[in-house]
Each structure stands twice: as C-alpha cells, then as structure tokens.
Amino acid sequence: MSKTKNRNSLLSSHNRTSVSNSTKDELLAMKYVMDKPAIPLYPLNELSNSSESISEQNRYTSNSSTDELTYPDFKPWKDTTHLPKGKSEVEVEKLNNEAYLNKGYFEGPSVANEYYSARNLIQASLFSSSSNCDKVLKELSQHLVNSYRTRNEVINKIKYNSNKFKIPPRVTLTASKKEAWLRDLANPDEPLSNISNKLPHGIKNKMLVDILCSKNIPTSRALWLTKCVLYSELLVLKKKYQSRLPNNPHPVENTTSETFETQWLQEWTHQLVDYFYKFSKDMCNITIQEKKQVYLTKLNYLLNYVQALYIECLLDKSFFLTSILKFLKEGLPLDQSHVSELLAFSRSEGEESSLDKWLVDIDLNYGQRLISITLVKMFWKDILELDYLSKELSELLLLNYYFIERIPTYNTKSSNYSHKQNHTAALSSTLKLKLLSSISDTVNYLFKHNTNVFIIPNYWILVNETLYKILLSDVANSYDSEEQTEIRKQLKLIKYRNESLMLSMKDVQSSNFVDVNTARNLAKDRRRSNSLQQSLSQDTKNNYNSITGKKIPNTVENDNYFINRNSDDTLNIIDQLDRLKLNDTLAEMLIPSSISSSPDNFNDWRVNLKVVIYWAITIYREQMSSSEGILIICNFLKRKVLQNISVKNVNSIKAEFENEILEIIYNLAHCTDVDIIDYNLYVLINELYQLKVITISSYLRKLIASGLFYVSPSADGAQSHNENNSSVETHLAILQNLPVLNNKQCDSILRKWTPNGFNFEEKFEKGKLILKEELVDRLMSNSFDGYCDEKLTYIKNLKVGLKFLLVNWLTNYLKTSITKSPKLIHINPNIITSLYNFYALCDNLTVFFKVLIKFILRNEGKVIICYMDSLYLISKLIIRHFKLVKFIAGKSYESTTTGYELFKLIILNYKDLSTRDNDYYNFSDVWYFIDNAVEKNEPTYGKSSDGNNDNALKHKNFNQLLFAKETVDSPMRIHANSNTPQKNNDSYTATVFRNDLDLLLEAPIKLLNNTDITDFISTLELNVSNEAFNEISNTEESVIIIMEYYFKNIGEFTELHENLCMRLLINSKRSLDMTTRGIFFDIMKHFIINLVRTKPGIEKLITLFKKLMCFEVYQPHELFSTLRSILPRELSHEQMDALKYELLFGNPESDNKNLFNDQALVLRCIRYLYVKRHSNDVFITLLDSFSNEKETFFNSYALKAYNSKVLSFFRQFSISNTKFFMDGLSKVASNSDIISFLNLLIYISEEPIGSSSDLPRLASIIDEFNLPVCQVLIKIIIMNELRDSNKDKSIEKLRYILDMLLNNLKFHFVSYNSYFGELFNYLSWEHKLNILSIFEHNFLCNTEFIVSDDKFTENSVCLMSSDGRTNLLSILKDYFKKFSVSSLNTVTTSKEVFHNLSKFLLKVLQLANADIIGDSRRDAYNTISIFLRILIIHKLSLTSMIIEQDGQDLHFIKNLIALLESKFLCFNNEKLRILLYDLLLLMKSSITSSMILNPDSNLADDMTTDTSHQQHSPSNDYLSRSNPDGTEVGNSNSKYFGVSNISTIPNLSSVFNISEPNISYPLKKYTDDSKILCALMLEESELQKGGDIYALNDSKLILLPSRREALSSAFDILNETQQTVSKKRFKIESYELLEDTGIELNNGCINLSLFDAFTTKENPP
C-alpha cells in the first residue's frame, strides 16, 4: 500500500469521516496496489471434477466455458475472477458502486432479525433438561466430528488411482550423453529430480558395479540406481515368465514367480560377488603407490556399497555369505592328488623345505583372502548365527592357515631376496604375519564360541595339528591354566569326533598313499606340464622307465587304499618315530597326567612310552650311525615331555615317568619273545641317565628289591639251567654298561655274579691314557696329521657306560687344555673329523654339538684358529645331524636351543673369516638351510600390543615358538625370537642375526681374483696362462685343463694341492654358470666320455667321482643322472654296477684308502642325505639290478657286494614306502623270490615262511615294527592260496587263514590298538570285503550276551576265538576302527546284514540298560564301539536299506536312539555317546535326502511334515557344498528339489527327536570380543533394523480395510460395535522402495491411499 495510515483507517472503521480527507483517486489506487493473498482459494467441486486442473499460475480454470466453480460457505459465493469473461464483467460492475466504495464490501443479512431464526427455540429445548443436554451435545459434537471425517474421507482423501508411480524408463544414449548423465548422478548438488526421468540402457550386473565405483557415486544415489536397474530387470523377467505360461498347459508347481525372483536375486548376487572376486585378485598386481591409493579408494567404496546392499536386503544374504567364503577356498590345492601329496610331505623325513618347494607354483592370492576375511568380519554377527556357515568358515580358516604358514616370505626392504626365492606365492613377512594373526584370532573365537563347528572330518587329517597349534600356543595363557586345560579337553573330544567320522576319504587320492619322493617328482612334473592327476603306479612306472630305460608291465592292480590313522594310534606313533616327527601332540601323549575318561585308554601314556622305548631298541629299526635315533628320542623325552611339565606336582609326575621307564627296562629282561638290540638298550639307558631322566640308584634299588640276585650263583649248581638265568644275564649286562665308577652296590653284584669281575676304574684309566696320547696331546701340539681307527680299537670295544664316561672326561679336558694353552691351537678339517669320529664311535654326538662345537666356534679364549674349510665342515655336520641338534635339551625348557646358538656362531665366524680367507665353498646352501630352519616371522598367535606379555614370551612360551613348525610336520624349524633371553655380554640379537642372514642370502657369487689365480697356477705348476681362467671365452678350455691335470695326479696330490686344483675348477664352474647355466655339465660330459674311452681303471674312475661329490662339483643326483646317460654305452654291466653301488653305499676301506679323512666323512654325509631324500631313485636303481638277473635277483651285484647295506635300505624303504616297495618287487621278481627276500628282511634265514601252513609261526612274530614286511608277505601268501578259487572257496580259505592267525597272535602292547587292524590293508578290495564279511558275521552272530535281572548273575558279553583261548572283542574293535577310517569304497549292505544288525541291536540295547560292573564294562564298551563302527562302514548304503526294510516304522532308528539314551552310554561313556549322536545326525541327513529325492518311497502317508527346522537355511546346493559331511540336518528346502508335494515327506523330526549330548559351551566365557572386533563389523541392530526396508516391513504395520461408512447410520454411531476384520502384514521388497523424485503428491513408490492419507485444503475466513 502506498499509504499505510490510509490503509489502517480504511480497515479499522466504517466512519465516513475516515475517508473525508481521501480522494477517490487515492481509494482507487489503493484497490490496485493491494497484495494478492498467497493462499489459493479451493472450490468445492474441483476435487470431484476430473476435467479441472490447476494452471501454472495457480489459478483454477475450466475446460468448459459453461462450468462454474462452487466454493463452500453457508451461502456459497462466487469469485468473479473465476467466472467466464462476460459474467465476470457484470459482477465487477455490481461491485463498483458508491455504497461499497464508501462503506466497503458487505453482505446483507439473510434474515431481517436473528430472533426470527430457530436458534432461540433450539437453545431452549437443549437446556430445558439437564439429563438430555449432555447426550444431545455429545451427539451434536459427534456429528460435527463426523462431518470433518467425512470431508477428509470423501473430499480431501487421496484417491488410490491418483498414484502414477513408475520406474524411470531405460533409453539408449550416446556415449557423451551417458557420461553426462552419470556425471550428474555423481554430483550431489544436482537434484535427482532433474535426471530421474530416464536411465541409460545397458547398465546392469558387473557394469553397474564398476560404474558406481569408478564414478564414486554417493551411496544413496548408488542404491537408487541399483534398485531401478534391479526392478527393471525383474519386470522383464516377469513378462517373459507370463508370456510362457499359456504355452505350457501343465506348469511345474514349484516354478513360480517367487522362484524366478529368488534366481534373479541370486544371479545379481553372483555378479556382485564375481566382480568382488576379480577385483580382489587384482590386489597382488598393484605395485605403484599411485595405483595403490586408487585401489584402496575403490575398495573402500565397494565395502560401503556392499554393506548398504546387505543392510537393505538387495542381495541374497545366504548366497552372498556362502560365496564370500569361497574366496578363502579358491586357489587352495585340495584336489585328490594335492591332498595325497600334502599328506606325503607331512610324513617327509627330509630336513629340506620340501613342502615350500612343492608350493612353488601354487598362487595363494592374498588379495582375495584379505578381502574375504574383511567381509567375514563385516558380517560376522550373521555368520556366527548360522552353524553351517561357521563350520565352513572354520574349515577354510584352518586350511588357509595351513598353507599360508608354509609359503615363503620375503623382506620388503630387499628385492634381490624375493627374486632369489623364486616363489610366485611369496608374501612379505609383515603381510604374512598379519594374515596369520587375523586367522588365528578368528579361529580362537570360533572354537570358544561353539566347538561343534569344528566337526570337519573331510580335511581333519590336514588341519588338526594346525588347530592344536593355534589354540595351545597362546602366550597369554600358561600350560596349566584353567582355560588351557578346558581347551585341551575339548580338543580331545573334537579330535575323537572327527577321526571317528573320517569315512570314505573322497578327497584323497584313491590309489594309494603317495610317498614324499613321489610327491617331489609330481611337483617337478607339475612345473613342466601343470598336471596333477598322476597316480603312484603311473609315477612309479615313469620313474622306473626314466631311470632304467625299461618298461614295467601292468601286472599289479590299483586297489583303493589309503592309510589314515588317529593321532593316538600305536602305528601312528611308530610312524612319527620313524620319520622323527616329534611334535607336541606326541609329547602330550607321553605325559603321565594325560589321562582320558575312556576305560580303553586310562593308562595309554604308559603304553605309548613303552612303544617309544621298544622302537629305540627293536631289531627291526636301525638307529643310524652313532645311535642318532636313540639320542634324538632321549632328548625329546627330556625337553618336550619332562621340561614341558609345569603343573604343581611336577616332581611326582617326573618320578612316575622315571619309574615307568625303569619298569619297562626291567620287564624287557624277562621277555623272551621280544627281538631287541642289546647295544641299543645300553645306549638308551646311558643317554637317559646322562640327561637325568632316570637315575642309576633307582634302577639298582628296583633290581635289589626284586630278589633276583638274592641267591648266590654258587648256591645252586644248576643255576645255569635256571629259568631266571636269561634275566640275570640281561641285568648283569646292563650293570656292566652303566656309566658308574665306585658304585658299591653295582660293584658288589658284578663281583658276585661275574667270574672275572668287572673293573670299571682300570678300564677307564686306560681309556683316558689312550685319548690323551692320540687326541689331546697331538691337538695341543698342532701335530695332528692323521687319524687311525686302529689306535682307538680299545675304546671301541669298551662297554657303553665307559664310553660315555670317557666322552665327558675328554670334553672337559679338551676345554680346560685349550683355554689354558699358551699358544694358538689350529683346528683344521682333519681335527674336526677325528673328534667327530670319536664321539660317533662312543654314541655321544649330543655332547659333540652341544659342548665341543659350541666351544670351538665361540673361541672365548681367542686361542683357536679356524678357517673356512673347518667352518664349512662344521656347517655340513650340523645340517647332517640337524634333527639331533634341534632336540638337544638344555638346562631347562626356557633355555635357547642349541641349533639357534650354533647358527649364530656360524654366521659370526663366517663374517670374521670372510675378511681374511677366500670362500670357494658352497656356503649359499648353508644360508638357505638356515633360512628354512629359522622362523622368519614373529609369533602369529596370542599377541598383545602392549608389553605385558613380554615376560611370558621370554620364558615358557618362547620354546613353543621355537618348536612351532613341528606341530605341522614341515621341516623342523627354530625361531630366532628377538625376545630371547640374552646373556649380559651377548649383543648379537635375533634381529641382527636375521639381517645378517638376509645379507648373506643376497651376497653375489665371488670369483677368484687374478692374484689368487696366479698363485694357484704357480703352486700347482700348471703350464697355462692366467687368461685361460680370466676370460670367459677360455673358461671351457680351463675346465678341460684342470680335469686332465687332476685325473692324472689323482691319488698323488697332497691335500693342499688338491684343494687348490678344485678351487680353480669351482671358479671356472661359477664363471660358466654366470653366463650360460648348464654348459659346465655339458663340458664335463664330454670330458667323462673321452676319459672313459681311454680305459682307465674302474677304481681310479670311482675315486674321481667321489672327489667330485666331496668338493660339491656335482650334487649326487646330478652325477647319477649324468652317469646314467653316458656310461652304459661305454662300460660293461659289471663295471656300471661296481661304479654306481660304490658311489651309493661305499666301502669304508676304499674310502679311507682313496680319500682324506675329512673327505671320507663328507662323502658319508652326502650319501646319507642322498639316499634319504632320493630313496625312490635308489630303490628303482636296485630294481634295475634285480631285473637283469636271469635266475634270481639274489645273484645281483648289489646284494653280493653290499648285502648288509642293501638289506638295511630295503628294511627302511619298506617302512616308509610300503606300497611302492610291494609293487616294485612284484614287477621284477617271482613270488618265491619275494617270499625269500621278505623272510630275510625279518631275519628269518632258515625255514622261511611261505604258505598258509606257516601262518601260525608268522602270527607269533608279527608286531608293530615288522608289520610292513608282514603285510606284503601275507598278501603274497593269500594270493597264492586263493588263486583260481571261486567266491565260496575263497571265503572258506580266508576263514581258515583268519582262524589260524587269531589263534596265534601275540601283542607286545595292547590288542585294542595294535597292528591287526592294518594287517590286511594291501589285499585286493575283493579279499578285504570278504574278510570284513567274515568278521562281521562272526561278531553279529557269535557274540554271547549274558543279561539277567538276577542280581547274583553278572551281566557280560564276549566273543571267543575258535580255540576258546582269546576274547576277540578288543582285537576286532581295532580292525573295524581302522577299516572305517581307511576305506575308500562304499560297502554294500545286504538284507542279511541288516537283519543281523537289527537283531544284534536289540541285544546291545538290553545289555546297555543292565547293570554292568568290573571288567565286563570294557567288553561292553568294545561291543558297542564295534557295532557303531560297522554302522559307519555301511553308512552310505545303510540308508537305502533302512528305508526299504524299515521305512514304515523306523524301528531300527528308534532303537538306536534308545541306545543313545541307555544307562551305559549316559554314564561315563561320553565318547561313545557322542559318536552315536554324530552317526544319527548323518543318518538323519541321508534318510531325509533320500526321502525328498524319492517321494514315492513306501512311507506312512498320514505323517505330516515339520518344516520348522527349514528356517534360516540356504539352498540345497549351498548346503551340500558348505556341509559335505552332512552333519547339519534339516537345512533343505523343498523348492530346490524336484518334489511335487512336500507334504508326502514323513515327520522325521519326531523320530529323530534327539538332544545334543552336551549343549553347554564351557569355553564361551573365555571369548575375547576384542580379538575379532573391527570398525567395519556391523552390529546386530544395524543388521536387524539398520535399513529403510526394516522400518517399512516392521511387524506392527498391517493392512486393514478403510472405513467408508462413517455417515451411513449417523444417529447409531454411539451404539456402534467394533467388528473383527482380517489383518494382513504389510510387506514391500527392497528393490521396490525407491526415492520419490517427482513433484506430484502421490507419485511415490508407496501409494499414500494405503495410509488413508488426505490433504487439508481450507480457504481463508
């Protein structure tokens, strides 16, 4: 307004004087400058007229000129601005009158007087009665309310058909427009409404994800685009589905729209996961920092995007979680051939890192594993709730830990080292540490949360020790803590359950158990052809053909056989001892406190200890030179068993352990049927005494208390014929071999019982004198020029105890003499060799390495001079005896290992010597060995960011780290931990040690300089110029010159001249290798061929090759390969045999004659390592020699010239490679020759065992140590006996053979855990099935039950042998147990077998509910155990038989459940109960699957289906993949099977109504959330309520019909009763929940009419 005062006066009063001062013009001006109200006017008829619309100027217009808008009022008025043009002008003229201008616009009253209305009358009526007043007012108010409600429901309510929602259409855009559209989408400032009118065509699946990531589109907009794309795709699918329906008159019932939606969502999830997988694999290719930053940014976006999709349910959660776990499995070598090779390497004897080399071409992509673990942590809460996912996760985590731990590492600060390793799978040490740490923490949490998810029988044989290591190596918990005790208890239970369920090892190569050498060959073949599908028989043939050039005929069948043993199996313990795989698991089984609740193994530790003692002294095991195996075992018992005990009653446990050892030794003297080596027994006793495991006084007290020597030998003239004579002689021999001086009790017994007495003191003094003259004096005077065994013959013939005493005296005397020496002492290889030979002669290499070598290398008095040659010899000796060095026990378990100290000293001495001496030795192999032997990383378990655990790490658990690699059966490793307790004067820390080792590994090859070459040529008086060695072009000529000169003077060289000559040759070899690798060997081949053609003496030729191996010009395998390729054409067969077997086995006399002392020692080490690491090649070489003999292979040169060494090799090879041994012999020898040869191997030279009539004699000598040979012998005998027999005759003969064996068997240990279970493992599958059938029939039909209600009758069960002397239950228990875990084929179940099982079950059930006391409990335990094992063996075929024979009532299943709840199993037999429980779960799964897949099976039709157990389950495909063992029951969904009517499936849940044996989780209280928590982890609230989808799909939102009858009965509203209406839950899919991008009110994805929504449109008053 132009004049405010005029407007105010105009509006405030109608007084004429208010405008007296105003002119007409002013008033007119005021009319036109008045602001128009912002509130529009709403006509009454606009909502009901669909033809009317609102113009852009917010003015209501009509499509028809005759229409008039009516506005609500008591007296409807008309807005002239909305009238047609003609009428509007008329109305305007009416308003332009003087009255309106003077007084303002006003309406006249409708009546002349208000009193003329009915108001007064109505008011009087209302208030005339107080009782009626309230009711009427209330009713009037209700009418007024209803009028408003009616207006909102009828007039203002949003109509359903007003919703015009639709997803943006997909249009084809040019590249530039598409890019612009995506750029606008990524711009948060650009309104979504501007671009939401269309979508670019072609954006879907992986392209969609890639565009979102690359454009970095905000998450909210990314979700909008994703929903639009997904919804569009679904609509297309639905249209296709609808279009096909009319064409199919009989559609499949389960092919519904819901099925399409499920498949569609899974396909989208698969695309997303696949993109994530490929993206994760690219992580390893990022090497530039800029690309790394881009990659991390994209990864961060992807994680946020996937998290949003998961929360908003825009993917299939079950499918997604299952798929991300596949990242962990992808790339792992888990094929059948892989697992066989892995198991072979776990049994490997070699110290070299064989498994690391095997992993050379396996790409364990760390990117996919890191991202998978990240996603697992993100969705951890959901995964933890699903047992089947937790089970798969636990298995995959353990497998990943198993492999990642073994792959090599490299230092990120060094590029050369990584290149040197040449491993595609190599990880940086930091990354490997973090990966293992994350996996370890996750496994720890999973195990403590729910131990049942670790029932993973398929790969248990691989990962069981990994699980033990992770859980038991936590530095935060002491060994005897409550938590660790409970963990060990649960581990035993988990181990039992997994080992019991390991049936039909489908993931293991079926033909056999691949030995380690075959595995190495397969690994080599893999590098060439990348093929992993070779069986052992084929590999054997290939090896044989490649080495011998001959063809092996296919005469031996490939039987499905696999050795799978439980960890506590006696044969498994022996196998560990044979391979010296001495880990914590074995140590735990030897600790007296390790007691199980099972009646079977109450004293198992005693049995296990007896096995260890017997293994050390049995005649069937050769303990290598110097009794090294015995020394290793004794040090293992000291360090890993006794020093590892930390419980309160440690002294009593050690005393019990000592008493048990003495009891075993004492009983040995009284056993006449045990074949032992007496000398080994004496060494064992002396070493145990030296380690203070046993004491002599305890043995003497036990001996005296026995009363054996109570009677004087002269008291009875027939004493020599007394039955105790053998025992007395054994004990007297032990006393004479004890390391005691001046022991009155021992001397008294020996004087009394030996004719000439035994003077310890005299022999000891004489031995001291000899050692002083021959060793100490010559060493101190630097005149040690040679060593002669003859001079120490007296020492060699002394008793073992005196040898040990002399070793200790010499060691102390040498240390004292050298320390006090006034002059320098030179230590050369000859001295090292002489000292080594003496200590080996006295069976005391422990002291040699632990004390003497350490003393020499430390050189604390600085009086010892040691050069490179001596240091290299020491290094090679340590490598040769590393397993002994590894286990040498210190003063306590916390002390640093001898191996690590020696490695440190070698490096320190090398660094010192390298400044003043040339290195022409192959020290690179030494550094590589140390690198493999020493852990490169810090511990990956039980870490803490603070320093609170430092002390624990420094003390007890430090040695758990030192021995960390033992538990996984990889090369034995030590841990150079920086927290190792250091001496005050020891500043050489583990970090410095690691850095020095890295530098040495990267050091370049050194060549001789010109000065050295000139000096060498001058000293050797070679007629050649320096240029021949300095110029590469002349290097080939220099090799020929040196070799010709060397061979000419071989045998006449002094040691100095020979060393110089070899230095020149090695220098030329290095020069050639630096240019063209392999050319040196080509030159040598030509030289050897030319040399052989000159017809030199074979002895001189052998000496040359020995020298070349000693100086490592040739490695043994390189030399033998060269000789096999060139010499057969040049030498006769006899000459070739003499050459190769002298190089392989050697003659000590020839070695000492042609080699220097130290060279002979080096050659022995080289031979030992070659034969051990290439035993297959040696075996095939011997087979070649055997096959060349026309009559019998006993005439072969090898057996004649090297009989004892060849037989020793075959004994060892038959133990480690039994199947290969058997197949190889069968290919080159007749059965009669093989039988004679096998008899020789078990020391039977007279009356050999060769037919079924000899089996009683064989049964009496079979034991666990000669089992491999006896297995092969029994196989050949049975093959000969059953040849040309039909099935019935074969079974009868087998029954006869089995009766003879069972009637004559003897057991040194226990019958329930013996050799018998594997005695028939190498028979054909047909014969094994027949034997199984015989034993099953015997057990099910002949077992006698005595069950009575009479309290005076003892309830019992037994199964006697045919001669009535032996109860066979424990023997058959061992057989069925080992058959069940080693069988590969499915065993069929006949009706007769099922009938026998059903009858037997009723008897067992009766027994299990009776009172059983005393020894009968053991028989009952064995009976039920055997029965369950038979069920496990028949499990796969038993399912169909149960359905066929018992499908109507399932009596068999019900009886099994009754057995589960029986009195015997419910009390003190937890293991049996758990085994039956797991078996029932497997049977339930199998029966359920069979019934679902066979809906027409003959089952009760009136049983209903309980589908409650089907909730929270993935599809069957994912179930079978994630849960291959089938222990997760009831997780199948009918729509994923071809079942037309799911209701026909019986109600198995009611039948299998069983509860877990133990539903408590005792370890849950120890879970530490901090170990698995991370910033990305979604909380339960986010997973359950975090997304918009959860807010809308809340259970409180329901659909009800709208109330539209508000005015239908106006005056009855107060009395209206509520009617019950049906409720329906409101639900909307996540992809349907789209953001409203339009401007219209009701064009969103949710129709507002569903909420009875209305608009409020009120005109201004």
Swiss-Prot record:
Coiled coil: none annotated. Its main location: nucleus. GO terms for biological process: regulation of transcription by RNA polymerase II. GO terms for molecular function: transcription coregulator activity. Residues 1-22, 524-550, 1501-1527 are annotated as: Disordered. SMART domains: Med12. Keywords: Activator, Nucleus, Repressor, Transcription, Transcription regulation. One of its GO terms (cellular component) is mediator complex. It holds the Pfam family Med12. The keyword Ion transport does not apply. It is found in: Nucleus. InterPro entries: Mediator_Med12. Residues 7-22, 539-548, 1505-1527 have a biased composition (Polar residues). It comes from the Eukaryota. Component of the SRB8-11 complex, which itself associates with the Mediator complex. Belongs to the Mediator complex subunit 12 family. Component of the SRB8-11 complex. The SRB8-11 complex is a regulatory module of the Mediator complex which is itself involved in regulation of basal and activated RNA polymerase II-dependent transcription. The SRB8-11 complex may be involved in the transcriptional repression of a subset of genes regulated by Mediator. It may inhibit the association of the Mediator complex with RNA polymerase II to form the holoenzyme complex. This is Mediator of RNA polymerase II transcription subunit 12. It comes from Debaryomyces hansenii (strain ATCC 36239 / CBS 767 / BCRC 21394 / JCM 1990 / NBRC 0083 / IGC 2968) (Yeast). The gene is SRB8.
